[in-house]
Amino acid sequence: MDMASLISSLLVLFLIFQNSCYCFRSPLSVFKRYEESTRSLSNDCLGTTRPVMSPGSSDYTLDIRMPGVTPTESDTYLCKSYRLPVDDEAYVVDYRPHANMDTAHHMLLFGCNVPSSTDDYWDCSAGTCNDKSSIMYAWAKNAPPTKLPEGVGFQVGGKSGSRYFVLQVHYGDVKAFQDKHKDCTGVTVRITPEKQPLIAGIYLSMSLNTVVPPGQEVVNSDIACLYNRPTIHPFAYRVHTHQLGQVVSGFRVRHGKWTLIGRQSPQLPQAFYPVEHPLEISPGDIIATRCLFTGKGRMSATYIGGTAKDEMCNLYIMYYMDAAHATSYMTCVQTGNPKLFENIPEIANVPIPVSPDMMMMMMMGHGHHHTEAEAETNTALQQPKREEEEVLNQDVHLEEDTDWPGVNLKVGQVSGLALDPKNNLVIFHRGDHVWDENSFDRNFVYQQRGIGPIQESTILVVDPNTSKVLKSTGQNLFFLPHGLTIDRDGNYWVTDVALHQVFKVGAEKETPLLVLGRAFQPGSDRKHFCQPTDVAVDPITGNFFVADGYCNSRIMQFSPNGMFIMQWGEETSSNLPRPGQFRIPHSLTMISDQGQLCVADRENGRIQCFHAKTGEFVKQIKHQEFGREVFAVSYAPGGVLYAVNGKPYYGDSTPVQGFMLNFSNGDILDTFIPARKNFEMPHDIAAGDDGTVYVGDAHANAVWKFSPSKAEHRSVKKAGIEVEEITETEIFETHMRSRPKTNESVGQQTQEKPSVVQESSAGVSFVLIITLLIIPVVVLIAIAIFIRWRKVRMYGGDIGHKSESSSGGILGKLRGKGSGGLNLGTFFATHKGYSRKGFDRLSTEGSDQEKDDDDDGSDSEEEYSAPPIPPVSSS
């Protein structure tokens, strides 16, 4: 009997170990199976996520589609990311949409480097990208394919291009999914590794604050921005509104002359149409857009928003420009000056007729079957979200570009910074001269004339990427440089506090084109300045403004040839400064599309804004975070104001830092400090259209470059402990109703792979465990019956008690009651890969950095490797 028990136990152990082999397969094999399952789209979708090579060409195509989704609510925005299959520089040269307006309201294709989520797809309300994103393609209303001109492409990959595509689809009416079908809307892009001489980009002009009153027959939404980047050549345009839009028109305004870029009804297929006539847009031109709406039939006001009941006013201009200084994406969101639009061509006010049949088809395709009462109630109760077409609600944080070598430039006290029309950084510094307590007497007369002017070049033109000095000027001309501004023609406008003068210096000239003020003579009349600090130039009129200054608390306006026009401002008379009072107006910036001039009122710790033409006070921006001083201010298109404050006074705790502000309401959007060195006296700030910001420090003798980065990876320190902010992750969890499978293509293979393995094992082992637990019981019962039958034959009825004991021993051991027996419940509950919840709890410590010892990482890259692209022929 002991021998029989031993054999039975060995048989059970064999079966159990066989069970573990079936249940807990190799993580490598499971992960391979997971990879294979993600290599193709849903069975309901045609196509593949892998690149498809073009026969006889180095080009390849990539299907970018939704992975078979079924929205459950109307006005759902879903996003999905796709990794560029190669890291090398490449170019998108063609788009082919796969979409139908009966299902999708519109779709957009973004380019970026850090998608907002690693999921297979996600709710776009959690964001599209965590870094700067650019629109590469847009589709709506059954628009036909877009064909790029020969030699033109959207740059992707490499050092400066996007590594990810993010597809966003707006699903309008959920009634289209009553049959529960799975949607695979998307676009096929054709990519070539061959370098394109011309780089494509998109200029987006859009309104953020248009209101369409109910019943009003004609409502105009006007947008205009001064263009100050290298020349672009528009070749296609696309318009976008919702139901109330009648026509959208875009123009180039040059020296008062309006030239049509494109005009179309937004109720027709929203494709990219060819521009009316070939033209170029150069620095100094104005890009103006008008959307014509009607409020007829509405019972309540209609606002800008992302739902079908809201409205939008968007004009996309697809352009190309020389690859040497290409910019892939630009925006304009400023409300147009009414005086400018008094001269808009009448054609912009004429709706484009759309046949009733076409209109009905569009309405049915959008699923706009809402009653007026529903529209009125929803408009009143819902705070409309802005559609992702706007690309403005990105959580952007500025961080120092630590790879930029410009911080180590050998310069003196940096007093002024600006960007020229070619987007080069221009630095105005004091060389070996220093402003200290011995520089002036009590009457503000400069005391160190005997040492002569600064002999080295005080104006340096620096490459914004490499910090290489491209050009230098300003030798033997200045004593104590201060402010710097560059106009649309590339002229330098500078001030010298020792000379008490303002200079206009040509970019290619050694001698000034214009000089205002009397050298070394401070004064307060119209022909004198007293330590003037800065200049701002109105790009439309050419008039310029002088902040004067350390000892005159005023702003002066002059004509382009230097004739005095007007002045305003007075010295602060109390601890509660009134509007228009200054205590060192230290820095100026033009808000040209608003017709405003903003002043950094340094010692009053605030920013004041005025109507440029009249000097009338508009508003002030003041925050406790500013502390007691605001040194400089700079405006960038898109409604963002940048500023830097001063070092805290003794006993104050306000840090010296940079600020990113919402110009419309003055709110602080972000603060930033350098990673290398420290701010000592940040004296000037310059902001580019692409979100890049430069700060010059007069005490640290340094210039820093700050670039936008993903805000959710920003860390804050509390009591010396660094804490990672995960707000954005929490938002993902809140918005997602059902978590789709994880998409490994966003670089999270190491972190997510164990989870995939365990889930797969758990799914396989459940059925096997139940089955294999039954089999040994049946086998053991059969063995027990066989043994009993043998003993009955050998010993007859006397063995009844022994057989009961033996049988109880075997079954008792199986039940875990016998001492030294095998407890199956304990065995499975403690075996690797199994727990009461189906799998072991994963370690959360260090999972982002470390791999399993058993995995060398080689296999985890299979999913992302693309077939090698044939080299470009040298012929």
UniProtKB/Swiss-Prot annotation:
Residues 3-394 are annotated as: Peptidylglycine alpha-hydroxylating monooxygenase. NHL repeats lie at residues 467-508, 516-561, 569-613, 666-709. CDD domains: NHL_PAL_like. Its cofactor is Zn(2+); Cu(2+). It is found in: Cytoplasmic vesicle, Secretory vesicle membrane. Pfam families: Cu2_monoox_C (PF03712), Cu2_monooxygen (PF01082), NHL (PF01436). Cu(2+) A binds at H105, H106, H170. Glycans are attached at N465, N662, N743. A protein binds at R430, Y550, R602. InterPro entries: 6-blade_b-propeller_TolB-like, Cu2_ascorb_mOase-like_C, Cu2_ascorb_mOase_CS-1, Cu2_ascorb_mOase_CS-2, Cu2_ascorb_mOase_N, Cu2_ascorb_mOase_N_sf, Cu2_monoox_C, NHL_repeat. PROSITE patterns: CU2_MONOOXYGENASE_1, CU2_MONOOXYGENASE_2, NHL. It catalyses: a [peptide]-C-terminal glycine + 2 L-ascorbate + O2 = a [peptide]-C-terminal (2S)-2-hydroxyglycine + 2 monodehydro-L-ascorbate radical + H2O; a [peptide]-C-terminal (2S)-2-hydroxyglycine = a [peptide]-C-terminal amide + glyoxylate. It is a single-pass membrane protein. Residues 40-763 are intragranular. Residues 395-716 are annotated as: Peptidyl-alpha-hydroxyglycine alpha-amidating lyase. Residues 850-864 have a biased composition (Acidic residues). In the C-terminal section; belongs to the peptidyl-alpha-hydroxyglycine alpha-amidating lyase family. In the N-terminal section; belongs to the copper type II ascorbate-dependent monooxygenase family. This is Peptidyl-glycine alpha-amidating monooxygenase B.
